[in-house]
């Protein structure tokens, strides 16, 4: 059983949803980013998505684009992101880490080398937003062969004809993007999310995590009553942007994570 399978199974037994937190690797700098990463589990994060900075983050809203820019300006590379996971794993062998980003940096790094190093570092899953199922052979197949889950995004515009193809080789969990568009924009109604999850469950037994637009403990609690996982990214990244220094960024991100975790746990079904 993979770390992701284990974590979702444990939470299902507890009768609650997972808090899935997103931060960009290297934002606002390597050391502060690593401190945030190491602090997230104790602050209540059940699964961590770690963004791989890329110069053209087309699916991301302004907050995460700016986070990517800060990370790249601070010298973050894919090699450093993998090193960050290695350092995290020294003290934490249980919290799943999912790398999220775009295919280009992985292609440049070399797929075979990336998969080998990601596995060795302790990466549990990948979300590659610009790699559709038609290109499974390029990364999804070798990643899954190495024991790394490949997590698919589905959206309100993914129709019933397309869903089976998208979900066919998915593993770990399904990431439902509750608002079509870029990250951090708007939020979906609970009625819409309820319908969407019911539709997804007709096609998959995988846990379903819902993200995009969730910013407050109250919103997190509302989604936690419906989904297997609640994904929060832009709200955490905004705390880094607003902080006066790296120390404040660490403190504020972990404080918000703790509040979100309280919301998710209060919604135990």
Swiss-Prot record:
Entry's Gene Ontology cellular component terms = cytosol
- Reaction(s) the record says it catalyses: (1S,2R)-1-C-(indol-3-yl)glycerol 3-phosphate + L-serine = D-glyceraldehyde 3-phosphate + L-tryptophan + H2O
Sorted alphabetically, which Gene3D superfamilies does this protein's record hold? Aldolase class I
Which InterPro entries does the entry link to? Aldolase_TIM, RibuloseP-bd_barrel, Trp_synthase_alpha_AS, Trp_synthase_suA
Q: Superkingdom of this entry's organism?
A: Bacteria
Top-level EC class, please?
lyase
Name the Enzyme Commission number(s) assigned to this protein: 4.2.1.20
Task: Recite the UniProt keywords alphabetically.
Answer: Amino-acid biosynthesis, Aromatic amino acid biosynthesis, Lyase, Tryptophan biosynthesis
Pathways per UniProt: Amino-acid biosynthesis; L-tryptophan biosynthesis; L-tryptophan from chorismate: step 5/5
So where's the catalytic machinery, residue-wise? 49 (proton acceptor), 60 (proton acceptor)
Give the SUPFAM superfamilies listed for this entry.
Ribulose-phoshate binding barrel
Q: Identify one Pfam family in the record.
A: Trp_syntA
Question: Which GO-annotated molecular functions does the record name?
Answer: tryptophan synthase activity
Q: Which PROSITE patterns match?
A: TRP_SYNTHASE_ALPHA (PS00167)
- Subunit relationships: Tetramer of two alpha and two beta chains.
The similarity annotation says: Belongs to the TrpA family.
What is the role of this chain?
The alpha subunit is responsible for the aldol cleavage of indoleglycerol phosphate to indole and glyceraldehyde 3-phosphate.
Query: NCBIfam families in the record, alphabetically?
Result: trpA (TIGR00262)
Family annotation (HAMAP family) = Trp_synth_alpha
Q: What is this protein called?
A: Tryptophan synthase alpha chain
């Amino acid at each position: 059983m993979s770390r992701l399978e284990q974590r979702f199974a444990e939470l299902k037994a507890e009768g609650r949803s997972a808090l899935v937190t997103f931060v960009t690797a290297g934002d606002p700098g390597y050391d502060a980013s690593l401190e945030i990463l190491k602090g997230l589990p104790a602050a209540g994060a059940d699964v961590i998505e770690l963004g791989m900075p890329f110069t053209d983050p087309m699916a991301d809203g302004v907050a995460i684009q700016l986070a990517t820019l800060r990370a790249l300006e601070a010298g973050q590379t894919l090699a450093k992101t993998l090193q960050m996971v290695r350092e995290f794993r020294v003290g934490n062998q249980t919290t799943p880490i999912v790398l999220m980003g775009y295919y280009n940096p992985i292609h440049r790094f070399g797929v075979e080398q990336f998969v080998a190093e990601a596995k060795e570092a302790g990466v549990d899953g990948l979300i590659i937003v610009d790699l559709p199922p038609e290109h499974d052979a390029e990364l999804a197949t070798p990643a899954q062969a190495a024991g790394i889950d490949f997590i698919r995004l589905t959206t309100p515009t993914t129709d019933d004809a397309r869903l089976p193809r998208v979900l066919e080789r998915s593993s770990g969990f399904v990431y439902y993007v509750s608002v079509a568009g870029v990250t951090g924009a708007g939020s979906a109604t609970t009625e819409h999310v309820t319908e969407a999850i019911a539709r997804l469950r007709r096609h998959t037994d995988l846990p379903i995590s819902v993200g995009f637009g969730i910013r407050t403990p109250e919103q997190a609690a509302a989604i936690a009553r419906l989904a297997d996982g609640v994904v929060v990214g832009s709200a955490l990244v905004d705390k880094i942007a607003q902080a006066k220094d790296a120390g404040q960024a660490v403190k504020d991100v972990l404080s918000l994570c703790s509040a979100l975790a309280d919301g998710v746990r209060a919604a135990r079904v």
